[in-house]
Amino acid sequence: DMLFDMGFIRDLERIVKLTPPKRQTLLFSATIPAEVQQQAAKWLRNPDAIDITPEAIPIKLINQKIYFVERDVKDQMLIQYLCSTPRGRTMVFVRTRMDADRVGRNLTKVGLTAVSLHGEKAQAKRKRAITDFKSDEPPILVATDVAARGLDISSVSHVINYSVPEFPEIYIHRVGRTGRAGAKGEAITLCCSDERYHLGRIEELVDMKLPTAEWPFEDFPDLPHLEKAYHRKKTGHD
């Protein structure tokens, strides 16, 4: 389903047109929104629908907190949290590849070891970033959702949602990367005013009110000049 957001639907349609009329077609999708249903009606003949029960939502073992913040101080708050919190392997999720690179540079600028991971990164650099993240001294991994899909890393201690995902299922995929194998996990979300709608949809899916908290640290430390986010009227997934 995320291929639609990446602009690959036309490629999929061309591929289907090149397949023989007499064939068996199987369609797999993590979610079945209206767009997927429309394509299924075009590509499949009298299909049997198989709905696999999703894995249990990892709520109990994960300490989740929502912090309501102003957008223009997200980077400062992220840096303060990372510098002030005892943590192990840490993933920071952002919405776009530009955010991944920018946030990674800002973390590096203040002395934190960080690498970015997104779909536009060269394959060799992506492999290196993943290898480094799996090492005994892992950098902070700043990743987009699409780029992080398929990563199987069991010992992530902290997940930080720099941006609230637009699709509630993605939130579960993100926070589910911590708290595995019975371990405790931490997942925090920095939510600004225009992201509260997405937060509400997440709470509907998990059927609970996610706990909110006051920011636990004092005034921001002196930081070097940080790159500001570039705001687009319409954002896409990278």
Residue ranges and their predicted role:
Residues 224-238:
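Non-catalytic terminal extensions of ATP-dependent helicases
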Residues 1-227:
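Conserved helicase RecA-like core
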